[in-house]
């Protein structure tokens, strides 16, 4: 669910998901559109694709089980929403790995976005 997702982002990056990642670029936030080309936006594009491939969890706002082990997110092994958890984990880690490239000028990006990336 969004709260769990936000907690993963906060713990991995030290940044609150809002406003840092909610409106950044063209794929981040609700209803991502087309690629801006930033690394954070690429993380969001991959996350959107991950959600499209989910099979075990009916809705992307369902709760899942996870824990932290040695500073690593561990998704619940027997959880029917494990795939959803793995998608959220992947983007939180991607944001952390790209912290040095975060550019707040794209935080409230209102200009038209570039041509869409290849389909998932």
Curated annotation (Swiss-Prot):
Site (Cationic membrane-docking site (MDoS)): 111
Keyword terms of this UniProt record: Blood coagulation cascade inhibiting toxin, Disulfide bond, Hemostasis impairing toxin, Myotoxin, Secreted, Toxin
PANTHER family in alphabetical order: BASIC PHOSPHOLIPASE A2 PA-11-LIKE, PHOSPHOLIPASE A2 FAMILY MEMBER
Domain of life: Eukaryota
Species the sequence originates in: Bothrops pirajai (Piraja's lancehead)
Disulfide bonds: 26-113, 28-44, 43-94, 49-120, 50-87, 57-81, 75-85
Site feature location: Hydrophobic membrane-disruption site (MDiS): 110
Record-annotated site: Putative membrane-disrupting site (MDiS): 3, 10, 15-16
GO cellular component, one term: extracellular region
Site (Putative cationic membrane-docking site (MDoS)): 63
Summary of subunit composition and partner proteins: Homodimer; non-covalently linked (probable alternative/compact dimer conformation).
Designated name of the protein: Basic phospholipase A2 homolog piratoxin-3
Chief location of this protein within or outside the cell: secreted
Tissue distribution of the protein: Expressed by the venom gland.
Chain's role: Snake venom phospholipase A2 (PLA2) that lacks enzymatic activity. Shows high myotoxin activities. Also has anticoagulant activity. A model of myotoxic mechanism has been proposed: an apo Lys49-PLA2 is activated by the entrance of a hydrophobic molecule (e.g. fatty acid) at the hydrophobic channel of the protein leading to a reorientation of a monomer.
Residues under site feature: Important residue of the cationic membrane-docking site (MDoS): 104, 107
């Amino acid at each position: 669910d969004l709260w769990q997702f936000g907690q993963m982002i906060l713990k991995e990056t030290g940044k609150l998901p809002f406003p840092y990642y909610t409106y950044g670029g063209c794929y981040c936030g609700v209803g991502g559109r087309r690629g801006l080309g930033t690394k954070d936006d690429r993380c969001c594009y991959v996350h959107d694709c991950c959600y499209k491939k989910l099979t075990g969890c009916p809705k992307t706002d369902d709760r899942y089980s996870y824990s932290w082990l040695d500073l690593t997110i561990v998704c619940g092994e027997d959880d029917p929403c494990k795939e959803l958890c793995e998608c959220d984990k992947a983007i939180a880690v991607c944001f952390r790995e790209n912290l040095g490239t975060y550019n707040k000028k794209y935080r409230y990006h209102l200009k038209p976005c570039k041509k869409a990336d290849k389909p998932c």
